[in-house]
């Protein structure tokens, strides 16, 4: 049986947040999360049961791939009945990718899965890591009066915003406020108090058990359009062996060149069973393929409309 004390499993995949300076060499090294309270003594003030799991060896987030997402899902699924929430410490470069993937892989999720990290190592003087870690743990443990989780979904917490995982993008390589959710408001804002937005938070079906998914098809490419893009580039990309899907980043509200060869290449690809999804290159806004003639040509070629900016 699980104790009444709120319980959080901390999963360290790698990244800047888990680094401390070696006093002898000055080099940054991964610290042992079994000694977490030594490095973040503030956690003692929480009346929580905090356990940790760390990837061995930790990975640079630039090396993140679907196999590691499956590993995270397995860890969460295995421990699902023993913890109230989960905090994943992750490098910032691909954190948004992982958060988005987990939001689909953890079907019927009814507990918080909060990803966070830092721009400065937790062992440096001005680190943002401690605040991010402490707040992420507090959010992961937070419950409503009826005992249900306040935020039962996959999120990213960074600086002072809690954001839906599959709506979040890294926007800055240096600032502490490195992530933003352009097309969906923050689920919580953090200052002196944590101010949740209950009307924006996903409501799970309590009758459905967690349904984990482990398999991803890697045969997907991104086609970013630009003025002057050549037919040879599009042709070679659409004929990659084994290709299953294309995420096509278009102009504005979903517009693309009207050249005959371009539309023909797209149509031939969709007729071969390749899925082509139209998303905008813009940071915010959405695709409206019926708004301009260029968008109508894409629809006729079998391109699928993305309802939101990914």
Task: Locate each region found by the language model.
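ATP/NTP phosphate-donor binding region
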Residues: 1-78
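Internal gly/pro-rich beta-alpha loop/helix module
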Residues: 115-191
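Conserved small/polar residues in nucleotide/adenosyl-binding loops
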Residues: 308-310
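Accessory alpha-helical/coil subdomains and C-terminal extensions
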Residues: 5, 11-15, 36-44, 164-248, ...
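Short Gly/Thr/Asp-enriched flexible loops that form oxyanion-binding sites at enzyme active sites
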Residues: 88-111, 258-265
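Short, acidic/small-residue loops that bind anionic groups at enzyme active sites
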Residues: 99-130, 138-143, 270-280
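CN hydrolase (nitrilase-like) catalytic-core segments centered on the catalytic cysteine
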Residues: 251-288
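Glycine-rich, charge-decorated loop segments at or immediately adjacent to ligand/cofactor-binding or catalytic sites
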Residues: 121-133, 283-297
């Amino acid at each position: 049986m699980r104790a009444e004390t709120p319980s959080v499993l901390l999963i360290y995949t790698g990244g800047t947040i888990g680094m401390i300076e070696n006093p002898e060499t000055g080099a940054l090294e991964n610290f042992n999360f079994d000694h977490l309270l030594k490095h973040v003594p503030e956690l003692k003030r929480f009346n929580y049961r905090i356990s940790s799991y760390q990837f061995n060896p930790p990975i640079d987030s630039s090396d993140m791939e679907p196999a590691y997402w499956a590993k995270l899902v397995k860890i969460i699924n295995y421990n699902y009945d023993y913890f109230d929430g989960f905090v994943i410490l992750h490098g910032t470069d691909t954190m948004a990718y992982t958060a988005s993937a987990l939001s689909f892989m953890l079907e019927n999720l009814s507990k918080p899965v909060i990803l966070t990290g830092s721009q400065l190592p937790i062992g440096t003087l001005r680190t943002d890591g401690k605040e991010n870690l402490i707040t992420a743990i507090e959010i992961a443990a937070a419950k409503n009066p009826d005992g249900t989780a306040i935020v039962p979904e996959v999120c990213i917490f960074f600086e002072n915003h809690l954001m839906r995982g599959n709506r979040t993008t890294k926007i800055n390589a240096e600032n502490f406020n490195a992530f933003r959710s352009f097309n969906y408001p923050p689920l919580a804002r953090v200052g002196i108090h944590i101010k949740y937005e209950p009307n924006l938070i996903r409501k799970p079906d309590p009758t459905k058990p967690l349904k984990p998914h482990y398999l991803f098809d890697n045969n997907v490419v991104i086609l970013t359009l630009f003025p002057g893009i050549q037919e040879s580039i599009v042709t070679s990309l659409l004929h990659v062996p084994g290709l299953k899907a294309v995420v096509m980043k278009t102009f504005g509200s979903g517009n693309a060149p009207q050249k005959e060869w371009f539309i023909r290449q797209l149509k031939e690809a969709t007729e071969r069973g390749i899925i082509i999804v139209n998303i905008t290159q813009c940071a915010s806004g959405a695709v409206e393929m019926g708004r301009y003639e260029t968008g109508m040509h894409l629809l006729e070629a079998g391109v699928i409309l993305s309802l939101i900016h990914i």
